[in-house]
Amino acid sequence: ISIKRGMILMLPNIPGMENLALCDLVSRRMNLPVVLENDANAAAYGEYLCGAGKGVSDMVMLTLGTGIGSGIIIEGRIHHGRHEIGAELGHMIVEADGEKCNCGQLGCLERYSSATFLTLYAARLLQSDSRPSVLREMTKSGQALDARHIVQAHKQGDELATQVWLRAMKFLAIGCINICRIFDPDEIVLAGGLVNAGSDLLDPLTKLYESMHWKLTGVMTPIKLARLGSDAGVIGAAGVAWTALGSGPPDCSAHLDEPRNEK
């Protein structure tokens, strides 16, 4: 999409919507001003306004789901970049000459730490590794593996599942270190379905991340889990619209309940 022009440039999964002036179309129908924003950026803005990023100036969010989305907030504003593709952090290279990502590039973070490729790596390991595993028993019974099964097996001490999980955490830690080296944000926020693993994600990730970080006092960028769950995108989209009206970012924290889980 083009935020500046209010256009859909290309939707690979929905043919026929190329170069669609969406904002103009909806604005004419509704007789109201319309703004356009990427869903990952909107979710990051929601967390910045009244979630895990409330009160900071600079924040980077990674959304860990079937893929890895991201949003970058710099001095309270969404960063789009010159070509409006400045927040594709799921496609930063974390393994030179690594495995091929769906985007066509080799070694992308998404290829190593998303839920989709976590499951694919587990399936591949089950074929090449003879160790007993509850994951193997699940596949024999005809059950399709997903990331939740891998996390649960890891919690139970399954060696193969732990290998799969810690591999994903290693590459995610590399991605977080790269973010710190480039942006030096106040914090990194993690969202998406994988964050439901809670401390089973945050503890090993933080240990690996801290081992790679600068050994300087007071420069450790914290990694936090998102607080708004699936509401973040809606809240952020409302914030984008509110800000576009010239009213400044809203304070919506008084209307929020306890932290939500991702769906």
Regions found by a protein language model. Give the residues of each.
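Structural signature of FAD isoalloxazine-binding scaffolds in flavoprotein oxidoreductases
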Residues: 85-88
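Active-site glycine-centered loops adjacent to acidic/histidine catalytic or metal-binding residues
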Residues: 39, 65, 237
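Conserved Rossmann-like nucleotide-binding pocket used by diverse enzymes
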Residues: 10, 60, 224
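Short glycine-aspartate micro-motif
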Residues: 35, 58-63, 69-71, 102
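Gly/Ser/Thr-rich active-site cleft segment
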Residues: 1-22
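Generic enzyme active-site microenvironment
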Residues: 37, 45
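ATP-binding/phosphotransfer module of carbohydrate and carboxylate kinases, centering on a glycine-rich
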Residues: 3-5, 23-32, 46-56, 78, ...
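A cytosolic small-molecule/anion-sensing beta-strand core signal
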Residues: 4, 38, 74-75
